[in-house]
Amino acid sequence: MNVPDDLKYADSHEWIRIDGDTGVVGITDHAQAELTDIVFAEPPKPGAKFSAGDVGAVVESVKAASDIYAPVSGEVIEANDALADTPSLINTDPFGEGWLFKMKLSNPGELDALKDSEAYRSHIAL
């Protein structure tokens, strides 16, 4: 199970990669493995605003539909449009091409409530 050290993780299995005051959000390798084959992804539209913990996106697999939560508060600045045609990118490259959305952080202090890679590994019992 891949858990990159340069990301922050939510208990609900989202990750965020920080670059200044923006972040890229996706779901973890653990989450995509639990969902199995993802057949549909609906990222949020640019301009959408979320508080930490709000539903930000939806993914559907052959097994279930799952809400994806915003790990921090902010405004969506870009959605991964490639997922419309190839939602399986979330399975094959969850930390790269399978990202869901980019957001401008409105409260960077919320990052402190997220887990580092070691704490997330413990959370999923790796």
Predicted regions and their residues:
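Acidic, low-complexity mobile loops and tails
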Residues: M1-V55, S88, T92-L126
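Conserved protein kinase catalytic core
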Residues: S66, A84, E110
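A short, compositionally biased micro-patch
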Residues: I18, S61-V62, P71, S106
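Helix-adjacent hinge/juxtasegments
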Residues: P46-V55, A64, A70, E75
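Short, solvent-exposed cationic patches
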Residues: T22, A48, E75-D81
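Short, conserved catalytic or interaction motifs in soluble domains
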Residues: S61-A64, D81
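Short, charge-rich, low-complexity interaction segments located
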Residues: V76-T92
